[in-house]
C-alpha cells in the first residue's frame, strides 16, 4: 500500500477538491514498521450537511480494507470547500508522540 494508491482510490470514490496525505510514521515509536501513521486532509463538497463523525465514517468505510491491520493511526481532517476557505487552512500540525519510560 502506498500513499498514492490511497489517494487515487479516494479520488475515484468521492468528489474531491483537494487531498493531501502525509506519512507521520517517523514521529512515532512504531516508525520502524513502515507506513503506520497517516494524516489525510480532504476537501469535498460531498461533506456538505454531514456531521464530522459522518464524514469520518465515510472515509473510514472506504479505506477499511486497505488499512486493516496495517495502519496504527489515521488522522482525518475533512472540510467542505467553504469551510476550508473560511479557515484559510494550509496544513494541519503534526502530532508528535514521545516515548518516555516505555509509556506514551
UniProtKB/Swiss-Prot annotation:
Matching InterPro entries: BolA (IPR002634), BolA-like_sf (IPR036065), BolA/IbaG_stress_morph_reg (IPR050961)
Family membership: Belongs to the BolA/IbaG family.
Pfam family, one: BolA
Name the record gives this protein: Uncharacterized protein BU473
Lineage: Bacteria, Pseudomonadati, Pseudomonadota, Gammaproteobacteria, Enterobacterales
Disulfides per UniProt: none
PANTHER family linked: BOLA TRANSCRIPTION REGULATOR, BOLA-LIKE PROTEIN 1
Amino acid at each position: 500500500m502506498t500513499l498514492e494508491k490511497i489517494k487515487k482510490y479516494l479520488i475515484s470514490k468521492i468528489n474531491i477538491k483537494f487531498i493531501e496525505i502525509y506519512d507521520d510514521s517517523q514521529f512515532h515509536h512504531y516508525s520502524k514498521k513502515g507506513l503506520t501513521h497517516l494524516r489525510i486532509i480532504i476537501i469535498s463538497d460531498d461533506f456538505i450537511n454531514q456531521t464530522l463523525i459522518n464524514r469520518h465514517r465515510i472515509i473510514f468505510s472506504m479505506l477499511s480494507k486497505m488499512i486493516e491491520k496495517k495502519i496504527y493511526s489515521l488522522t482525518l481532517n475533512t472540510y467542505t470547500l467553504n469551510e476550508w476557505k473560511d479557515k484559510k487552512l494550509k496544513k494541519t500540525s503534526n502530532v508528535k508522540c514521545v516515548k518516555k519510560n516505555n509509556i506514551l
